[in-house]
């Protein structure tokens, strides 16, 4: 994908959208307003529940294999930045920053690769992250 995006920077938006779908950065949490039972689970007023956005991104209904990065996939309406009144006000700037960073990185360091023996590990939770990894490139 690195070579493809370096040669086709007009597809970077699609790559950013798809990577955010597959590896969301945050999960949404909500406070329970009143005691209730849901799916056999007793919830008390004041409890916090978390809705992992990664789960909705893996719904097979999005088309194709949801675990696979596919920048040609029709853009599903994922909830990585929330929905409706709960949409993150920084969603647009975040996508612009990701697009700009990737475009500039690929223009300046197009031949980077993972260092030998390095793997990329994604860690999810309330905030998603990528564990540190090493890159190398030719000067």
Q: Language-model segments: what does each one mean?
A:
Residues 1-139:
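Cytochrome P450
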